[in-house]
UniProtKB/Swiss-Prot annotation:
It comes from Arabidopsis thaliana (Mouse-ear cress). GO terms for cellular component: endoplasmic reticulum; plant-type vacuole. It comes from the Eukaryota. The gene is PDX1L4. The lineage of its organism: Eukaryota, Viridiplantae, Streptophyta, Embryophyta, Tracheophyta. GO terms for biological process: pyridoxal phosphate biosynthetic process. InterPro entries: Aldolase_TIM, PdxS/SNZ, PdxS/SNZ_N. This is Pyridoxal 5'-phosphate synthase PDX1-like 4. Belongs to the PdxS/SNZ family. It holds the Pfam family SOR_SNZ.
Length: 79
């Protein structure tokens, strides 16, 4: 088997998956969707106001942001 594929063996069979490149139109579409701003993680109203002024399209109010959880040795989601 030549090339840039992935082979996964399940029991006595094998499933192959070739690496596909996203077309330019998909990349342009993603860039256009993200153009309006970002979603920011905040812990209080002051941070939400700062995020809004900086151009955030939305905020997520959390008890603790993932960066703080990781800094304290915890495990947090990765985005």
């Amino acid at each position: 088997m030549a090339g840039t594929g992935v082979v996964a063996v399940y029991g006595e069979g094998a499933m192959t998956e070739t690496k596909q490149k996203s077309p330019f139109s998909v990349k342009v579409g993603l860039a256009q969707m993200l153009r309006g701003g970002v979603i920011m993680d905040v812990v209080n109203a002051e941070q939400a106001r700062i995020a809004e002024e900086a151009g955030a399209c939305a905020v997520m109010a959390l008890e603790r942001v993932p960066a703080d959880i990781r800094a304290q040795g915890g495990v947090a989601r990765f985005c």
